């Protein structure tokens, strides 16, 4: 359905923006929404810990997940990136789970009826592929994680959880972090694990890290200047933030950027590394040593590396270390995204943003 077929504007998240907000540039909106992330996460944690309806829904989905079959987290774009954190955490807890691209799943899967639980993750609730999946659900349990209570998906699905990020007019930032957090919380419920203490610890680190990393953004932009290509590399929960980070850089700035898993980059693309190449490598969690080794090999081939880790390291001409406070697994999927977010802002401030703010939902095409 197009905007012209509606009698009123389809405002993002169903909320009309203020006139002051409508006058802001994309770069200003993007920075504002990046800096709103800590408060949005706090709002989500408070609701998922204290709201009886949300707690009841989490318990309901936990029970439904006990059925035979894998758990599927289904999304597109930034929402797919959020799915990766939840699926990785479930797999680490010995529960079969997969992050699935909705467009691929819609057209090429004949096994969706075998899932114990399929969680549809969507910010808008209006993407054509996700709407179709909600209209024609599999025989297994279907649930929704969505940021728009006025959406088509929200009206079609009975079991649903809110993302609680508020309207988002720039590139996916706070919706990615909130949706990732919600996926992790649901995974913890399914695994029978407490989540609040680890989440609150991460949030404290996230807030201070955001300020520190964003203060370093010009240093990162200067380090990357002239790169023909930027790759973002992660493993486990941080693989989702690697995909999201590359999307953010490329969509907002036009700078060529691509994501890779650590193993995927090691076995092939590393052969292409030279002085025109920059890698942002997340050396975090249980596979941190593999990330450090990969960074050293990239530097040895003449490439430049922004190495994101929980240790202090001396910088060099081709190595820019960025230290993150250690957080409990799998919450590095949230803290690590701050580095590509900050770099994106610096590039946009220097060269301008390639996108315009989006205040209304447009035509949703496959």
Region spans (language model):
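Active-site phosphate/pyrophosphate-binding segments
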Residues: 32-69, 159-280, 288, 351-366
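Short, functionally important structural connectors and interaction interfaces within domains
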Residues: 21, 26, 50, 145, ...
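Membrane-targeting and insertion segments and their boundary/processing signals
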Residues: 4-18, 64, 104, 156-160, ...
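Glycine-rich phosphate-binding loops that contact phosphosugars or nucleotide phosphates
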Residues: 66-203, 207-208, 235, 270-271, ...
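Phosphate-moiety recognition in structured ligand-binding domains
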Residues: 2-30, 38-39, 43, 289, ...
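Short, positively charged patches
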Residues: 24, 28, 33-37, 55-58, ...
């Amino acid at each position: 359905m197009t905007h012209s077929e509606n009698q009123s504007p389809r405002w993002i998240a169903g909320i009309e923006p203020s006139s002051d907000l409508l006058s802001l540039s994309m770069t200003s909106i993007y920075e504002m929404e990046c800096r709103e992330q800590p408060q949005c996460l706090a709002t989500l944690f408070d609701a998922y810990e204290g709201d009886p309806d949300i707690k009841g829904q989490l318990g309901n989905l936990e029970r439904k997940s006990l059925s035979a079959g894998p758990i599927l987290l289904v999304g597109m774009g930034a929402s797919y990136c959020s799915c990766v954190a939840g699926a990785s955490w479930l797999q680490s807890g010995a529960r079969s789970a997969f992050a699935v691209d909705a467009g691929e799943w819609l057209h090429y899967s004949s096994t969706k009826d075998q899932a114990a639980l399929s969680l549809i993750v969507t910010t808008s609730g209006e993407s054509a592929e996700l709407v179709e999946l909600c209209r024609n659900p599999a025989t297994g349990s279907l649930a929704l994680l969505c940021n728009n209570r006025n959406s088509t998906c929200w009206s079609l699905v009975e079991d649903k959880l809110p993302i609680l990020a508020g309207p988002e007019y720039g590139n996916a930032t706070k919706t990615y972090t909130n949706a990732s957090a919600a996926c992790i919380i649901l995974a913890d419920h399914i695994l029978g694990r407490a989540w609040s203490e680890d989440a609150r610890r991460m949030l404290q680190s996230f807030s201070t890290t955001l300020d520190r990393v964003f203060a370093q953004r010009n240093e990162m932009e200067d380090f990357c200047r002239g790169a023909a290509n930027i790759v973002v590399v992660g493993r486990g929960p941080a693989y989702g933030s690697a995909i999201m980070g590359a999307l953010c850089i490329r969509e907002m700035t036009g700078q060529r950027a691509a994501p890779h898993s650590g193993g995927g980059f090691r076995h092939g693309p590393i052969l292409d590394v030279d002085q025109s190449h920059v890698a942002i490598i997340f050396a975090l969690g249980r596979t941190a040593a593999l990330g450090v080794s990969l960074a050293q090999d990239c530097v040895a081939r003449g490439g430049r590396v922004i190495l994101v880790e929980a240790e202090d390291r001396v910088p060099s001409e081709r190595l820019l270390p960025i230290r993150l406070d250690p957080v409990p697994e799998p919450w590095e999927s949230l803290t690590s995204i701050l580095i590509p977010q900050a770099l994106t802002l610096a590039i946009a401030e220097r060269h301008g943003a390639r996108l315009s703010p989006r205040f209304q939902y447009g035509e949703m095409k496959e």
